[in-house]
A protein has these predicted regions:
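RNA-contacting regions in translation and RNA-metabolism proteins
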Residues: 1-214
Length: 214
């Protein structure tokens, strides 16, 4: 809610002619507002030494901002966060402290970018296919972090990177692989060559031979 004479930053999205003159259309939900606030609070962004490469936003709830710098000695994430988080907190304060903002490092390598976009989840493994789908394998202890509340974290990461992201539990995948390998090993053991003929022999055939010997 807004109060009379309350100061609030807005983004002017459109100026148009109305029946009573010019109408100014403003927004507080746009990505451009977020860019403007970082330019205001972070000198490196204002000067262009830190570049905002992408934003995924669900206004009033959470945003992910990917930043990059090609200048040596500049930490783009640290510059935007500020000492003790003072810079990013100033941006969050503009939204009444209600919108969480994740600042991440931008990478031109999709696998690295996707893995970083899913933070705070760590130790994720990313595999890509030709249809811009990312299969991400996450340790069980980080699964809820990767997905986020009501799927928000993975949804924002998908918007930010442009990939459809499918999350799978790493341990569950390993267990399934182990089951398949065990089954294959069992099949091989059941069809080992006979010592005499060199032909595959099943367990049942082996038992018959043992009975004949007796």
């Amino acid at each position: 809610k807004y109060r009379l004479n309350q100061m609030r930053a807005v983004y002017i999205s459109e100026i148009r002619e109305g029946p009573k003159g010019q109408e100014i259309i403003v927004s507080r939900a746009s990505k451009e507002l977020l860019i403007g606030l970082f330019k205001r609070e972070v000198p490196e962004v204002a000067k262009g030494s830190v570049i905002i490469k992408g934003i995924a936003r669900e206004a009033g709830f959470r945003s992910k901002v990917a930043v990059y710098s090609n200048q040596k000695g500049i930490d783009p994430v640290g510059s935007c966060v500020g000492q003790k988080g003072v810079r990013v907190q100033a941006v969050i304060g503009e939204f009444g402290g209600l919108e969480k903002i994740d600042i991440i490092q931008w990478f031109d390598v999709p696998k690295d970018y996707i893995a970083t976009a899913l933070s705070p989840a760590k130790n994720v493994r990313v595999e890509l296919d030709e249809k811009k789908v990312a299969h991400v394998f996450v340790p069980g202890e980080d699964l809820s972090l990767a997905i986020g509340k009501e799927g928000q974290n993975v949804r924002l990461a998908s918007k930010l990177t442009g990939y459809r992201i499918e999350i799978e539990e790493e341990n569950a995948v390993k267990t399934e692989i182990e089951k398949v390998e065990a089954k294959e090993a069992q099949t091989v053991s059941e069809t080992k060559p006979s010592d005499q003929t060199g032909q595959p022999v099943s367990k049942r055939q082996g038992k018959k031979k043992e009975e004949k010997k007796k």
